[in-house]
Amino acid sequence: MDTAKASNQLRKCLVASKSHLVSADSSTISIMSRLTLLLSLLSLLLLAYLARGSRQLGTKLSKLQSSNNKNFKEIEQMLTAQARLTKRSEQLLYLPYIQGQNPDWKFEVSVTSHPARFDALAIALTALRTQTLQPQAINVFIAQADLAALPDSVKQLEKSGYIKIESCEDLGSGKKLIPALSKQDKLPIITIDDDLYFENDLFLHLMINHYLYPNAIIAARVHRLSVSESGDVLPFSQWHKHYDLGEGPSKDLMPTSGAGTLFPPKALHEDASNAALYTKFSHNTDDLWWYFQARRQGTLIRRLSGLDHLNFIDSTQEVGLWKNGNQDQNEVNLKALLAQYGNPVNF
């Protein structure tokens, strides 16, 4: 009996233990499930936090990159301006040599305008008073039909003796130089556009380079002609615009006359002043005309370093040749000039 009782008691204990273990296992499983769920939620929150942090970091990096790009551009602009100033300073070193040659610093300025730019014309002309080297004359060529529209501010400049207004045939941009060539051929002529402010030493540097290269056209800005492997002139759109990798004098540099260009006497072929030929082959593409007529004369072109920055007068860019389809006209007239005169590099 004692053995049977002991056996029954042991059986009850085992059942109780088993029941307790099952209950414990269920409790453990429940706790593990909760921990797993909690860890999953924490993982999701961590991923969301990391994603948000990544976006914020990306935004900060983008802003930093943008700021750096701005800083780099500012530094680049400062270095470019410094390089221009250095080039101009270097040219002044030639002054003692030139002065020793008893130079004649006389020259004339030629400029044209049209009614859309008349309001700013007096500003452009008055600004020339700051030039270190002053011209013998500033000739302003205006189409006969436009004279009546000239504002009083321009007429007052003529009354003061500072400029001389000349009426001429309406040749578009060709008025910049064609009438001046017919007017005199003894002094260098500097051409400028009517919509720009210029560095106050532009005329001085043009004349310095004129004495260093007396037979060359001196231009503050140039385009470089491009040719194919066979030597044919490529379309104007493929030329190297605002070329600054060399100075010349060279056959393949075309002066852009509005930024400040000095034409020595006899630098252009006699046909340059022929209004009929200009109108036929190069109307409103005057720079191409001067270039071809220079090359026909055997004249080379030199780029003036350090003075190629364009500083436009406010409100002058609303109307201009480039806004009126002059891009296409360059292509058309280049083909006409090549057909008429041939490759200018080969002259």
Name each model-derived stretch.
Residues A143-K186:
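Active-site-proximal specificity loops/subdomain of glycosyltransferases
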Residues K60-A127:
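N-proximal low-complexity "stem/linker" segments adjacent to membrane-targeting elements
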Residues T126-P135:
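Short, acidic, metal-binding catalytic loop of nucleotide-sugar glycosyltransferases
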Residues I29-G58:
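Single-pass membrane-anchoring alpha-helices
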Residues E199, L204-A275:
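Conserved catalytic core of nucleotide-sugar-dependent glycosyltransferases
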Residues L187-D195:
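Short beta-strand-to-loop acidic/aromatic patch adjacent to the donor-nucleotide binding site
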